[in-house]
């Protein structure tokens, strides 16, 4: 599997909406698309307008699998970017 970054800007009104989306995303990945999509982590962004966005790290067969996952889970996918390499300076907090 390849690693990807997915940008989801201003997609949620509040933390409760984000939690609901995360639960559905996990369900779709684990139950409907096992072996095709693997959610690694997300960084939550507070947008200027007060909404929440995310920078999500996934592993997937390809970008098409991530687009299908987003569609099934009802998630936006503003941008899907393949990761070329990783430079680790410090472990994540």
Walk through the language-model features, giving the residues of each:
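Short S/T/G/P-rich N-terminal loop/turn motif that feeds into the first structured element of a domain
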Residues: 1-47, 63, 68-69, 87-93
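A short, glycine/Asx- and small/polar-enriched loop/turn
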Residues: 49-52
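Conserved short beta-strand edge segments in small beta-sheet-based binding/regulatory domains
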Residues: 75-87
